[in-house]
Amino acid sequence: MTTRILGVVQLDQRRLTDDLAVLAKSNFSSEYSDFACGRWEFCMLRNQSGKQEEQRVVVHETPALATPLGQSLPYLNELLDNHFDRDSIRYARIIRISENACIIPHRDYLELEGKFIRVHLVLDTNEKCSNTEENNIFHMGRGEIWFLDASLPHSAGCFSPTPRLHLVVDIEGTRSLEEVAINVEQPSARNATVDTRKEWTDETLESVLGFSEIISEANYREIVAILAKLHFFHKVHCVDMYGWLKEICRRRGEPALIEKANSLERFYLIDRAAGEVMTY
């Protein structure tokens, strides 16, 4: 697994609580909601223009500017300036995942002419929140800074009533990982990759493929969401959902559904145009 922890920050809970109270009253964007199964949303703290309405991520070469919301969060700004090279920051966002929501397994940067170094600083989480990369599952702990290899297939999910909050920072892509996180403590010896998922069996697979009996345009999105979440609970590769979906649609025999399944895999894993949105 190329994703790894870079260090730990001792969070000031009082000051963090003050900033989170401001965020709780703020408007979160639904941009990129086509990547979500359930409620996944974000708000920009820093971006290319400093304008709150700039929501899409593009490759640029100038230090990110604070948005009005970002300027109103003194502690989060301090975390950004103290633990990252501010001249290398291109975007900073708060990403919130709510109960029983996940990101559909995907690869980032497919629509960009370049890529960033993406890091997560965990602000609030619990044991029912997980990240995945390919066939691995892991838990990012509170106060930890992680490098996420977003070019590989990955996902994230929250299966708790309490939302998960991460400060996600995109760093200029030519920096070395050793330069990304600064003024941090060494991580603890805890094992972040303990895998308690169930074994995958032929019987389970046939149960999943049984969706071919009922799949239709009316329930297609709901079935995609179920398939996207299975790898959080069973020992399978996160992209296996696309093979299952294509086989379900093939067994159903409806050309429109087969085309939708192929388009879904293409968009999330293979190729997508700048500004392209997936509707399904």
Swiss-Prot record:
Thermal properties: Optimum temperature is 25 degrees Celsius.
Superkingdom in the source lineage: Bacteria
Biotechnology: Would be one of the most promising biocatalysts for production of cis-4-hydroxy-L-proline (cis-4-Hyp), a compound which was clinically evaluated as an anticancer drug.
Enzyme class: oxidoreductase
GO molecular function, one term: 2-oxoglutarate-dependent dioxygenase activity
pH dependence: Optimum pH is 6.5.
Keyword S-adenosyl-L-methionine recorded: no
Purpose: Dioxygenase that catalyzes the 2-oxoglutarate-dependent selective hydroxylation of free L-proline to cis-4-hydroxy-L-proline (cis-4-Hyp).
Family recorded in the similarity comment: Belongs to the L-proline cis-4-/cis-3-hydroxylase family.
Protein name (record): L-proline cis-4-hydroxylase
Organism of derivation: Mesorhizobium japonicum (strain LMG 29417 / CECT 9101 / MAFF 303099) (Mesorhizobium loti (strain MAFF 303099))
Lineage: Bacteria, Pseudomonadati, Pseudomonadota, Alphaproteobacteria, Hyphomicrobiales
